[in-house]
Amino acid sequence: MSIIDTRTPDSKHFISGVTGDWEVIIGMEVHAQIISNSKLFSGASAKFGAEPNNHVSLIDAAMPGMLPVLNEECVRQAVRTGLGLKARINLKSVFDRKNYFYPDLPQGYQISQFHYPIVGEGKIIISVGPDSNGQFEDIEVGIERLHLEQDAGKSMHDQHPTMSFVDLNRSGVALMEIVSKPDMRSSDEAKAYMTKLRTIVRYLGTCDGNMDEGSMRADVNVSVRRPGEDFGTRCEIKNVNSIRFIGQAIEYEARRQIAILEDGGVIEQETRLFDATKGETRSMRSKEEAHDYRYFPDPDLLPLEFDQAFVDSLAADLPELPDAIKARFVKEMGLTVYDASILVTEKAIADYFEEVAYGRDGKIVANWVINDLLGALNKDNREIEESPVSPNQLGSIIDLIKEGTISGKIAKDLFEIVWNEGGDPRQIVEERSMKQVTDTKAIERAVDEIVANNADKVAQAKQKPALAGWFVGQVMKATGGKANPQTVNELVKMKLGID
């Protein structure tokens, strides 16, 4: 099958070599573990983290005479994912045996889909940026296919000095292999693609996307070429398990290939591993072709067939996906594309934001959620589900500002109190006398005192109006940050005689 080049060479993606510019070409095969109680062809639990070999059925262990029975929930999840990727759903697909020997593959073959996958071509729109002008670039990355397959077990080589052990808990767990087209031209695009794909499957509830647990991992295909020339020979970097490592692996591998070609060498098609400690890729084995696996239809499984009504019923029940939510946030709440993009990265964040924003100014709420809430969560290494500040509490803080009860500065202090101690924000403001001073005469007395004690700066302020900010700061300090900032600003300018 010929590969179509969908992108026009763009100099901002070129990599400078000794002999001229090069372009990196990237495609990805992502293995996403399906959220399901049981495995693809057996009733054994698919739950992560059990003691070795506790979630193994006779089918998973490949005992003689054991026949696979397809898990319908896994089929539903694959179709839902395909719909989320705007892909063609194939009403008929076929399971094949992919034959190879490895200790953690007790059958001697993997049940996969080669010729007739359950999902055909689709697409993902990724946003890369912002650039120096604050603009984002939307890029379409094609999806070639999505197919169902079994995961293998896990070989462990560090448990004994002379023996290796095998854990079959993962053997037979349902995977979706999502294959992109070679449409990415930089490590940033590849990271954005993986981030977006993970976000989509999490919104759909078809994969938890926990890369640290191995439930989502990527095989990254990298090649380089002179801009405008045919695709070069690709190398596959296997099982990269973090978005940061995907970027590092691509950067290293592209430079490695360029160095070889500029020295007059040839790129060998091979499978490589990424060493996260050294930040480099190293050779694993020569890359297999499809014929090496001797694919043929699995005689124990009938072709998988369903009707359009089955697909339509699943489509009708899909949740609102991140692109649609982002567009709604921009259109209905007036958010910037940047802010909306941050808020939809996780469904829980979008849900939190919407709960706080209901009946309030979306821009103000977005500012608090992105800068204060997410900043505090990141500092404490917590997920939003663990936030000590609930949507109701944050909403109350924002309401207190709007009502003029507290200033923005006091609100920051109040947020910190609620974060560390909990409690009702309104009650805290009353009990701790945190209300801002709105009495104009009291504020005016404070302004008069600061002006009277700083005659030299008053004269300077008439020449440099920006010095008014210093006076505002001194008044706020004198009032313990409780004076209404707008009133202070107006009175300072009036007393200094500046516009």
Curated annotation (Swiss-Prot):
One of its GO terms (biological process) is glutaminyl-tRNAGln biosynthesis via transamidation. Keywords: ATP-binding, Ligase, Nucleotide-binding, Protein biosynthesis. It is an enzyme of class 6 (ligase). Belongs to the GatB/GatE family. GatB subfamily. It catalyses: L-glutamyl-tRNA(Gln) + L-glutamine + ATP + H2O = L-glutaminyl-tRNA(Gln) + L-glutamate + ADP + phosphate + H(+); L-aspartyl-tRNA(Asn) + L-glutamine + ATP + H2O = L-asparaginyl-tRNA(Asn) + L-glutamate + ADP + phosphate + 2 H(+). This is Aspartyl/glutamyl-tRNA(Asn/Gln) amidotransferase subunit B. Its EC number is 6.3.5.-. Coiled coil: none annotated. Heterotrimer of A, B and C subunits. It comes from the Bacteria. One of its GO terms (molecular function) is ATP binding. The lineage of its organism: Bacteria, Pseudomonadati, Pseudomonadota, Alphaproteobacteria, Hyphomicrobiales. InterPro entries: Asn/Gln-tRNA_amidoTrfase_suB/E, Asn/Gln-tRNA_Trfase_suB/E_cat, Asn/Gln_amidotransferase, Asn/Gln_tRNA_amidoTrase-B-like, GatB, GatB_C_1, GatB_Yqey_C_2, Gln-tRNA_amidoTrfase_suB_CS.
